């Protein structure tokens, strides 16, 4: 075995929230999980006072539908600004048209430009209507899961809602992983599914699945449309729910006979969301924000713990850090909300976070948790997490406050508004406060020097960490990166220095393999001028490899950096550490020819007309990556990596900072 050399990379209770009171049982609650504030959609015209009963699925049966005209006089509808340009319909105002055409026009009125839709018997009418739209592009995935993940990539990279469409039965159920992923990672998504005709619902008709019931617990809300006249209101509500407050997925199930029925739409229907609107958190009170500033002034070792809830507040967060000098540790979902290469960045914390980020939390006396949910992959053993610190938790979702970790001070509200308010207080009191955490930062700098992110090189083998480091250098940290799930995902989080929000697209809460390639499709569609790279593992990549065909047909310049170690790397790492290296079905190659690369990923690319190359030696890697980046259009680079590599640092599940592992790999026994 070749001698190993080490390479190093250094990166620079008082609760003010109250639980919402239960809503009146007389009003339908079109939301089952969250009580949230909203942000207005500037693309929507104002509504009149006309109200229709909501058609929502019953908890007991998909065929039982609530059809009640609800009195909402006590809860005013939100006032929406008028669109700068009047929408011009291709239909005359009094011209009857199919429900499918009404649905497509409703999407157009929401400003939708792209959908990811795969046709089937129960959704054919929608696809026919899409062909009559001059403004909506359909990107045809090769699998419905690819479609929903692509819609997520579109939404995550742009901040706009992603739209996917599937047929009934298996088409709809193929969306399930994407809906669950969007819910856990707070991604705005509107999924539209075809359904069997109303008269067949509940009869076990061909390709009938009660998708509203199936997805009830993995969507922010869902609808079964039982009246064609409700389509304009339901679509407006779906987009509002998906994008307001804590974003999430909304599913709209449309029976085929509704799609075929002729009607004259009323575009002036008001949204009917009394329960949702009544549970909005109010803007943060100045007194609460001033108390947080006081806690900061009294602390000696504060640290910021920021998550996905800060992605829309990166400017305000940057100003807050500038005013306070507090170091920033990010969750996996929060990467990019603060530049990873800044001297005050501690990079990522948690199970595979940096030693110095976890050290900062362990030794802090004040933890400022903004837009986070205290996930188990971050906290480890809850009782030991930030045990010396006062905790301030700001989040838009009241359900997250105190769910896993009880804060000393909590504010349920928009992180952006809270940061703006605190920045104002800090600016006005700068001379009085004279914040100086230099001693604390020096202490953390010692930890950075002592425990930098590092990896070892063995002969000519290519360390996967090195491949990502080279990609970061050649793209100047400006590419949009998507990943699958596994070791490569963690290395991509560690060794690529994200400078801006929405550069990092990864399945965090659900951990869905197969996410990376279709997510890159969505990102490329939303950002046609950006460099989009799917950093993937061979296990994740092959789960949605069929989407190479979509990339080719749509002429998307998606690059794939495939870190191929022929194994399910993360599971194998746990086998090494906790199961005496007993291999339990984690080898993905051909057991009869273990020395051969199997399957040959280059042939998948060739079958879809995509240029591809393989690199096996470290000395050839930089040139190979540069060629990938310089080649117009899509490209696949198969990087053969040793399977013995481990993602380090590592805090075992349920462990504490004292359990952190910083050495070792699959080449030694445990």
From Swiss-Prot:
Q: Which cofactor does it need?
A: Mg(2+); FAD; thiamine diphosphate
| Localization in the cell | Plastid, Chloroplast
Q: Where does (R)-imazaquin bind?
A: 220, 246
Q: What is this protein called?
A: Acetolactate synthase, chloroplastic
Q: How does it assemble?
A: Homodimer or homotetramer. The acetolactate synthase complex contains both large catalytic subunits and small regulatory subunits. Homodimer. The acetolactate synthase complex contains 4 homodimers of the large catalytic subunits, and 1 homotetramer of the small regulatory subunits.
Disrupted gene: phenotype observed = Lethal when homozygous.
Class of enzymatic activity (EC top level):
transferase
The organism named in the record is Arabidopsis thaliana
SUPFAM superfamilies named among the record's database cross-references: DHS-like NAD/FAD-binding domain, Thiamin diphosphate-binding fold (THDP-binding)
Q: In which pathway does it act?
A: Amino-acid biosynthesis; L-isoleucine biosynthesis; L-isoleucine from 2-oxobutanoate: step 1/4; Amino-acid biosynthesis; L-valine biosynthesis; L-valine from pyruvate: step 1/4
Q: Where is this region: Disordered?
A: 1-94
PANTHER family referenced in this protein's UniProt entry, alphabetically? ACETOLACTATE SYNTHASE CATALYTIC SUBUNIT, MITOCHONDRIAL, THIAMINE PYROPHOSPHATE ENZYMES
Q: Per the record, what is it used for?
A: Introduced by genetic manipulation and expressed in sulfonylurea resistant plants.
* Domain of life the protein comes from: Eukaryota
Pfam families membership: TPP_enzyme_C, TPP_enzyme_M, TPP_enzyme_N
Task: State which Enzyme Commission number(s) the record gives.
Answer: 2.2.1.6
State the NCBIfam families in the record: acolac_lg
Q: What does this protein do?
A: Catalyzes the formation of acetolactate from pyruvate, the first step in valine and isoleucine biosynthesis.
Q: Which GO terms describe its biological process?
A: isoleucine biosynthetic process; L-valine biosynthetic process; response to herbicide
Question: In which residues is FAD bound?
Answer: 186, 246, 308, 331-332, 349-352, 371-375, 395-396, 414-415, 508-509
Positions bound to chlorimuron-ethyl: 256, 376-377, 574, 653
Biased composition of type Low complexity is found at: 1-48, 55-77
Q: Where is the transit peptide?
A: 1-55
């Amino acid at each position: 075995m070749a001698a190993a050399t080490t390479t190093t990379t250094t990166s620079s209770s008082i609760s003010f929230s109250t639980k919402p009171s239960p809503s009146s049982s007389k009003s339908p609650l079109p939301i089952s999980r969250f009580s949230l504030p909203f942000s207005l959609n500037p693309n929507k015209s104002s509504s009149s006072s006309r109200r229709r009963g909501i058609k929502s699925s019953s908890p007991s049966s998909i065929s039982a539908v609530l059809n009640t005209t609800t009195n909402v006089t006590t809860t005013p509808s939100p006032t929406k600004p008028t669109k700068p340009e009047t929408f011009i319909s291709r239909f005359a105002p009094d011209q009857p048209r199919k429900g499918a055409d009404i649905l497509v026009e409703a999407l157009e009125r929401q400003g939708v430009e792209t959908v990811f839709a795969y046709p089937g018997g129960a959704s054919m009418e929608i696809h026919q209507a899409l062909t009559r739209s001059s403004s909506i592009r359909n990107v045809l995935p090769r699998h419905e899961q690819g479609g929903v993940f692509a819609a997520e990539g579109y939404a995550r990279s742009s901040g706009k809602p992603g739209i996917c469409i599937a047929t009934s039965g298996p088409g709809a159920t193929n969306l399930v992983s994407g809906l669950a992923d969007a819910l856990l990672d707070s991604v705005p998504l509107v999924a539209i599914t075809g359904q069997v005709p109303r008269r067949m619902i509940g009869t076990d008709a061909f390709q009938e699945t009660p998708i509203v019931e199936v997805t009830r617990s993995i969507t922010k809300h869902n609808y079964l449309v039982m009246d064609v006249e409700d389509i304009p209101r339901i679509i407006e509500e779906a987009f509002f729910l998906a994008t307001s407050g804590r974003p999430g997925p909304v599913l709209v199930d449309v029976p085929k006979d509704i799609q075929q029925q002729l009607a004259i739409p009323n575009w002036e229907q008001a949204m009917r969301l009394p329960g949702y609107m009544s549970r909005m958190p109010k803007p943060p009170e100045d007194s609460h924000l001033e108390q947080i500033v006081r806690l900061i002034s009294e602390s000696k070792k504060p640290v910021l713990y920021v998550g996905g809830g800060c992605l829309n507040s990166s400017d305000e967060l940057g100003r807050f850090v500038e005013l306070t000098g507090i170091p920033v540790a990010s969750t996996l979902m929060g990467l990019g909300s603060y530049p990873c290469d800044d001297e005050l960045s501690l990079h990522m914390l948690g199970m595979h976070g940096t030693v110095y980020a976890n050290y900062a939390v362990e030794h802090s006396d004040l933890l400022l948790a903004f837009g986070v949910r205290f996930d188990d992959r971050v906290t480890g053993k809850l009782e030991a997490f930030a045990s010396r610190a006062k905790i301030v938790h700001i989040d838009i979702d009241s359900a997250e406050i105190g769910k896993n970790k009880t804060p000393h001070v909590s504010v349920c509200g928009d992180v952006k508004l809270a940061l703006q308010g605190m920045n104002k207080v800090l600016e006005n009191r700068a001379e009085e406060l004279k914040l100086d955490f230099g001693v604390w930062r020096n202490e953390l700098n010692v930890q950075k020097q002592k425990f930098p992110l590092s990896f070892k090189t063995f002969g000519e083998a290519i360390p996967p960490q090195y491949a990502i480091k080279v990609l970061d250098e050649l793209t100047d940290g400006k590419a949009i990166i998507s990943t699958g799930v596994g070791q490569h995902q963690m290395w991509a989080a560690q060794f690529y220095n994200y400078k801006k929000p929405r550069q990092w697209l990864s399945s965090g809460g659900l951990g869905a393999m197969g996410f990376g390639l279709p997510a890159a499709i969505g990102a490329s569609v939303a950002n046609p001028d950006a460099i989009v790279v799917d950093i993937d593992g061979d296990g994740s990549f092959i789960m949605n490899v069929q989407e190479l065909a979509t990339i080719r047909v749509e002429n998307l310049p998606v690059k794939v950096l495939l870190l191929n170690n022929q194994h399910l790397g993360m599971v194998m790492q746990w086998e090494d550490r906790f199961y005496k290296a007993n291999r339990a079905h984690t080898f993905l190659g051909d057991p009869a020819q273990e020395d051969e690369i199997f399957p040959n990923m280059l042939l998948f690319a060739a079958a879809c007309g995509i240029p591809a190359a393989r690199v096996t030696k470290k000395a050839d890697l930089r040139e190979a990556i540069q060629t990938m980046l310089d080649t117009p259009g899509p490209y696949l680079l198969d990087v053969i990596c040793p399977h013995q590599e481990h993602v380090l640092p590592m805090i075992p599940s349920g462990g504490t900072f004292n359990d952190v592992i910083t050495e070792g790999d699959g080449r030694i026994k445990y």
